[in-house]
Amino acid sequence: MLLLKHGRIEILDQNTMYGWYELPKQEFLNSKQPVQIFTTKKYWILFRIGPERRRKAGMPTGVYYIEFTR
């Protein structure tokens, strides 16, 4: 799970390492279902897409911390 500066949660599907989901922080805290924003065939998408490419794609670039949960 990634907690982003702009108040949204971005979650990697840890079972398949395939789908990324995004959800406003408050909705996450209220236990609502996340919306899938994109999928990938590659592992470690965070490292594969650098800050410049993320900025051009309109994706968030700032991350406070990374916490992997099971």
Swiss-Prot record:
Identify the main location.
plastid
Record's subcellular location:
Plastid, Chloroplast
Keywords for the protein's UniProt record, in alphabetical order: Chloroplast, Plastid
Q: Which GO terms describe its cellular component?
A: chloroplast
Note the Pfam families from the entry: Ycf15
What family does the entry list? Belongs to the ycf15 family.
For this entry, the protein name equals Putative uncharacterized protein ycf15
In the UniProt record, the gene name given for this protein reads: ycf15-A
